Structure formats: structure tokens, C-alpha cells
Amino acid sequence: MSVNPGDFYVVSGAPSSGKSVLLRIVLGLEPADAGSVYLGGKDVTSKGPQERHVGYVPQSFALFPNKSVRENILYPMRLDKVGKVEMQETLDRVCDLLAIEDLLDKRPDQLSGGQKQRTAIARGLAKQTDFFVLDDPLVGLDFKLRERLIDDLKATRSALGVTFLYSTSDSLESLLLASRVGVLADGGISEEGDLDEVYDTPQAASSMQALGFPSANLVDGDVRSVGSSKMCSTVLGDVEVSGDVAPGPVLVGIRSEHVQVGTAREGAV
């Protein structure tokens, strides 16, 4: 997996596919079984979380219940011994970006679910770094709130000019947020690249299913040569094949948004 500066890189995969474990390895919270972790071109595989200087927004709200919103957001900056002026400037910036200025004196038990998540995101973004890891931060929220927070996250990343590594099992989130995407399947990244590239020309069935709203339908097919062209036979009928596809069994992905309704022809299903 390779994340470039300025990316909104989304790790997309089914629930329990290992997304959180992968992110925790990047953060230094879990050891890697093999391979190395590089941040900013430096090998940090043996470094602990504090030495990696990565901002983190976990899946759960994980707020201190006895501290105000203000103190929750200031906490990572106090750990990093940030100066008072810079702390206040950062607090003002993240609160303005996430529209939570009026919540600063409230405790978590006085907040709605959306306000708690905004506070958790603000605390993660208060870390003095240009690289942030967000582990499925919108899971469990209703659609309208998720839609609003998706807009907030895109605007925040753009305004700060930072890099986001984000995980989700929700294909719509992947499509709305990612500039680059890595599809996690069978214990590894099965495919990665620019979102448009992976969506338009997927090289793995896992990509077809992870990126789509709804997910693509997969059917078995068989490619055969017919004169100078190639045809693929499926239970849905025959279709001409373009590109460099070898004759033989294949898996055909059908996206519902690419299906057109027309007049039935002979042999159609």
C-alpha cells in the first residue's frame, strides 16, 4: 500500500476484512507480521505510536466523559507540549471547520451522536501533523448525518492540505471521499490506484464488489473466439468482448448503473 502526500486514500473492504488491523499497524498500535512501515520516507516499523506523529480518529467516539469538548480537543496538543498560542489557534481552526464552537463548554453526555463524532474528529485533527488516520469514523450514524460529515471531511482535508488514510466498508463513502483507493481482500491489498481507474477498469472481483452503489453483480462467463472478434457467453446472454481477454472461463461484473432497458431481442434473458 502506498499513500501519497495530499491523498484522501480510502481502504475499502468487507466488514472484518482487516481494515482496522491494517490502520493500527500504520499507527504503531500493532506489530506487522511481515514487511515495513515507512512514513515520510523513513522506516518507522520499530517506532512506537508517539514517535510516528500521526493523527488518529478511531471508530468509536473515545471521548473523556469527565472533560469538556474543549479539553478533549486540547488533550493531544498538551501531550505534544504545544505552546498556548498555537493550541488556541489550532482549537479555533478545527472548531470552525467542524462547526462546533458552541459546544466547547459541554461534556460528552450533553452531546448528540453527531456532535460527539464531530468532537472526536476535531480532536484527531488537532494533532500537529500532516498525516491523519481515520478508522471508519462514520459507522453507525444515520444517512443524513453521514452525508453532512462526508462534506465536512472533504472540506477539512482540502482546507488543511493534509493527507488522510481512511477505512470504510461502505461503498458509497469510498466513492464520495477517495482520491485514491486500496481494496482489502483475502488478507491483503488486492488492488490500488486512483478511484476512477479502479472503478472503471477493475482488475479484481473484490474491487467490483467494494466500489459500487449498489455493489456489482458477478456472473460466470466463457470467452470464445468468433472470427476476428471475441464473445462472452453468460446466463444473461452473449456480449462482445473488447480488449486483451484470453479465451476461457471468466467472471463478469455487471454494474446496475450501466444497465440500459431496451426492446428484447431473440435469445435475450
Outline where the language-model segments fall.
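ABC ATPase nucleotide-binding domain helices that frame the ATP-binding cleft
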Residues: 20-23, 118-119
